[in-house]
Amino acid sequence: IVAVGTQSTLELAYPTAHRIDCDGGVLTPGLVDSHTHAIFGKPRFEEQELRASGLTYMEIAAQGGGIHSSVRDLRARSEDELFALALPRLRRIAAHGTTTVEVKSGYGLALDDELKSLRVIRRLQSALPMRLVPTFLGAHEIPLEYRAAPRTRDEYIALVIDEMIPRVAAEQLARFADIFCEPGVYTVDESRRILGAARAAGLAIKLHADELEPAGAAELAAELGATSADHLAAISDHGIRALAASETVATLLPGTMLFLGRAKQAPARALIEQGAAIAIATDFNPGTSPTVNFPLILTLAVSQLRLSVAEATLASTVNGAAALGLAAETGQLAPGFSADLALFEIGDLRELAYWYGDNRCKASWMAGNACHS
């Protein structure tokens, strides 16, 4: 972006510039989806019925479902298969006004399969006019084969630290490392070790933090200077204060809690009132948030998190960029920023969160190149 101003001023300054008629629509910065799990094989629609019958997320996981189901499926697929499945998903994401997308690995949980997932993300970046931000999530779960003798969880953690992270860093396959810090998954101490190794290898860090139970993960994110702490539906008051006193962005995922049928959403207003920076994201994944519709997440941010439309828009642009370490590059319509734009067929910004479930995106651009039209 070289200039922002009134039509008359810009027409005088740039008389030969190519013009695009927005036909009275609303132009926003391209939406920044800072938390997705777009590299997977089959959907997990059967789990929705299991939850409706009364099973919890952790009970389904304990039966070999959840993340473990996606792991079995991804391991059986080739890189080419995963690429072919992910490509139309990312195009659908762009069709809803998103121009920057964080994409995680995490359904491999083995060296070759995690590398395979990250290489798919690299191929997707070459094939799509979007900005993809790759994240290594080898610590998404403890794989089933390390939950019983002769193998142990400590051996898997050693594999992540000693083999996965060095390979990911050496091949420059990821910008971030992430971990699921949650009771029953990774402890705070285990998370500190793994994230410390990732940082030492040159990766920035993120956390899945305090999603289902307060575990001190938000406090750990603040302690380590993580770029973001995500989920936070069960964050403690102490965790809120810790994030508010830090530079870590609190990324909230209201679509996940809605789809899981959980009444308790992240305490967005308390986080804002304490001074934390709030981002929102889709958490697009096959089990707990199968949506690419970012404007729907804005609707949920307003109706469920009690954000204003202005706050939700900020959370999906400026703060979404900050949650990816891109605050100086994208998320704003200002000189010097990348020309990442989304055009919506609405007459008022407040309509962006009003027509819930309806896609009003007419076109989107990343760095001036069309993502969707």
Name every feature range the model reports, one short phrase each.
Residues G24, H35, Q48, G97, ...:
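Divalent metal-coordination and catalytic microenvironments
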